[in-house]
């Protein structure tokens, strides 16, 4: 499939790192593949020095498939790259290299166990949402109450602290921890 003018310009722009922002089905993966192949073939960039990072496993799988036998430094999601880095150097920041990654069902099960003890009417998903939002803003459990003062902040802070303690005890990280 041919590249349009804008896509070809993106492929040929080689002045530094690239980010391709476009809607679904617009050819982002095709542009990235052509760009990487162009860098390797024409600019003599060593293939093992190329990182191709995306948001979804589906896109990462597609990039790997389309690259074929070309061996790159890394092709995968942001989460996968972070997990790889933490498995190599996580001990430098107190993370066991053999950590497990909790998905949403693991997280909800953990939260359900915590909230059984405190008798709250809030759902496990409510706590998961609030904890995820806090992590996205880099708010640690000990600082939660200093920042949030709504009617549920105290109980969320309590659950968040216990949640983090249990993750650490279980040598686990959630997807928010990876980023």
Where in the sequence are the language-model features?
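Short amphipathic alpha-helical boundary/capping segments
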Residues: 1-2, 23, 115-119
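Short, flexible, glycine/charge-rich loop motifs used to bind or transfer phosphoryl groups or to couple energy/partner
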Residues: 8-11, 29, 40-43
């Amino acid at each position: 499939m041919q590249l349009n003018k804008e896509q070809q310009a993106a492929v040929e722009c080689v002045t530094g790192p690239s980010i391709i922002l476009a809607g679904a089905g617009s050819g982002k993966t095709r542009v990235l593949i052509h760009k990487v192949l162009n860098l390797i073939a024409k600019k003599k960039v060593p293939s093992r020095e190329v990182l191709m990072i995306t948001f979804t496993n589906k896109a990462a799988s597609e990039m790997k498939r389309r690259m074929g036998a070309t061996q790159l430094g890394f092709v995968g999601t942001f989460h996968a790259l972070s997990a790889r880095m933490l498995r190599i150097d996580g001990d430098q920041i107190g993370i066991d290299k053999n950590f497990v990654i909790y998905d949403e069902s693991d997280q909800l099960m953990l939260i359900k166990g915590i909230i059984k003890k405190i008798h709250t009417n809030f759902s496990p998903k409510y706590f998961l949402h609030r904890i995820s939002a806090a992590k996205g803003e880099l708010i640690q459990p000990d600082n939660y109450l200093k920042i949030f003062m709504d009617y549920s902040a105290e109980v969320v802070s309590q659950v968040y602290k216990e949640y983090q303690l249990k993750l650490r005890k279980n040598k686990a990280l959630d997807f928010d921890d990876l980023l």
